[in-house]
Design a protein with these regions (language model features):
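Macromolecular interaction modules
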Residues: 1-224
C-alpha cells in the first residue's frame, strides 16, 4: 500500500551555528510528531547531485510519513503553531524552506532502513501528460534499480505546500532511492546501466527538468 509523505527542505540562516540548528530541529520534529496524523520522521543532510532545480539548493531534509488525509494533518499542524504547541525560535523566519506533500504512487516507504537516499525531483516537458509521465517513470525507476548500489525505491506525486519565493518549483514527481555507496560510485553505476542498455530513454527525456540530491541520515527514524 502506498503512503503519503511530507518533504521539508531547508537551509538555516547565515551565521547560525549548524550544531544549534541540528539540535533545534531534532526537538522540532518531536513536537510535530505529537500532531495527529504524523506517524514517523527522519532527518537527512543533503548534497546537490544533479541539476540546479529544487531541491539542490537546500542542506537539510525532514521526511515525514503522514497517515490519513495530508490536508487535515497540515491544518492541525498550523493550529498547533498558532497556539504555541509547536514553538518556533526567533530566527525561524530567516530559515529558507520549501515543503511538498508526496502522494504515494508506490510504497510504503521504510524510514527505519533508509540511512542513505538519492532523491530525484522532476518536471516533464509540457507536451507529456502527467499520467503518461508517471507510467513511464514506473518503468524508468525499475531500470535504474539495475544499477549497482540502488536497492529499492518509492515514487510520489508532488503537491507544493510551502513555496520558497527564491526558488519556486513546478516539480510534479519525486523518486526516492535507497542506496549504498559514495555519490561518484552511484553516478558511475547509473552510467554503466545506461551504457549497457538496461536503462532506456524516450526522445523527450532530455527535456525533463531534474533536481537531485544525495541525502545521508543525520538522525534515527522516529515514530509516534
Amino acid at each position: 500500500m502506498a503512503d503519503n509523505i511530507q518533504l521539508v527542505f531547508s537551509r538555516p540562516p547565515e551565521g547560525l551555528d549548524p550544531g544549534e540548528y541540528d539540535r533545534w530541529y531534532e526537538g522540532h520534529v518531536g513536537d510535530i510528531l505529537a500532531v495527529e496524523g504524523y506517524e514517523a520522521v527522519r532527518r537527512f543532510a543533503l548534497h546537490a547531485a544533479n541539476g540546479e532545480a529544487v531541491p539542490t539548493m537546500y542542506s537539510h531534509l525532514a521526511l515525514y510519513v503522514i497517515g490519513g488525509e495530508p490536508a487535515d494533518t497540515l491544518a492541525r499542524l498550523q493550529r498547533a503553531v498558532r497556539d504555541g504547541t509547536v514553538a518556533l525560535p526567533d530566527w525561524f523566519d530567516d530559515v529558507r524552506f520549501a515543503s511538498f506533500v508526496g502522494h504515494g504512487l508506490e510504497g510504503p516507504i521504510d524510514l527505519e532502513s533508509l540511512d542513505h537516499t538519492y532523491v530525484v525531483f522532476s518536471t516533464p516537458p509540457a507536451r507529456i501528460p502527467h499520467p503518461d509521465y508517471f507510467e513511464w517513470y514506473a518503468t524508468h525507476m525499475r531500470e535504474n534499480l539495475t544499477a549497482d548500489g540502488f536497492e529499492v525505491a518509492w515514487r510520489y506525486r508532488l503537491e507544493p505546500e510551502a513555496v520558497d519565493p527564491l526558488a519556486p518549483s513546478d516539480a510534479i514527481h519525486a523518486a526516492l532511492y535507497q542506496v549504498h555507496g559514495e555519490l561518484p560510485q552511484l553516478r558511475a553505476a547509473l552510467k554503466e546501466a545506461a551504457d549497457a542498455g538496461r536503462v532506456g530513454f524516450p526522445d523527450w527525456f532530455w527535456e525533463i527538468t531534474f533536481g537531485s540530491v544525495d541525502a545521508l541520515a543525520c538522525s534515527p527514524a522516529r515514530t509516534t
